[in-house]
A protein has these predicted regions:
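Charged catalytic carboxylate motif
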Residues: 111-112, 139
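Short acidic/polar active-site loop segments enriched in Thr and Asp
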Residues: 127
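GNAT-family acyltransferases
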Residues: 1-94, 99-102, 115-119, 123, ...
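Conserved active-site tyrosine of GNAT-family acetyltransferases
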Residues: 144
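Glycine-rich acyl-CoA binding loop
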Residues: 105-110
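Conserved beta-strand-loop-alpha-helix junction that forms the acyl-donor binding cleft
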Residues: 131-141
Length: 166
């Protein structure tokens, strides 16, 4: 399996191997990355667990797993981003992301979301990239809006966003 790297101006998104995903899914594993704050954020660990489960279930498709967000300037890992699963039958795919506390407010999440959404929408059959945020997570909502996503609905606890292909 060839692991994908998606490059943006200041960050590189490195697709996790199964071994790295397993290591990150463990409470103290680094996945082989040097983390800015010394440890991976919880959401990245959860996402790597989703990748491990997809491999075990035989549903994993290359490119549609978890990526580590790495700063180009120094190679430090600042967060994770990835897909909840491969695209569905309608061509829709959902993303999730988080960054370490020390990397927040610097535009890394917006850059990573923009890059992974552009990659996804360039894949055959993909029609839309979606994301959900907690209702009270205004920072994450701004990340999605800056990346071109449109708010499409709100429930009692979630805001749903979508970026459609051209």
């Amino acid at each position: 399996m060839t692991l994908l790297t998606i490059a943006a101006a200041r960050v590189r998104l490195h697709e996790l191997s199964l071994e790295s995903a397993r290591d990150l899914n463990a409470d103290s594993g680094s996945g082989g990355f040097a983390w800015l704050d010394g440890d991976a954020p919880d959401g990245t660990r959860t996402g790597s667990g989703t990748t491990v489960k997809a491999h075990a279930a035989g549903t994993y498709r290359e490119g549609w797993g978890t990526y580590v967000i790495v700063r180009a300037e120094d190679g430090r890992a600042v967060g994770g981003i990835g897909f909840h699963s491969a695209p569905d039958e309608e061509g829709r795919v959902e993303i999730g992301y988080d960054v370490t506390e020390g990397a927040r407010g610097r535009g890394y999440a917006t850059e990573a979301v923009t890059a992974i959404a552009a990659w996804a929408l360039s894949q055959p059959g993909v029609t839309a990239v979606t994301a959900n945020t907690d209702l009270d997570n205004a920072l994450s909502q701004r990340v999605l809006e800056r990346a071109g996503f449109v708010h499409i609905s709100t429930t009692t606890d979630l805001c749903a966003y979508e970026l459609s292909g051209i």
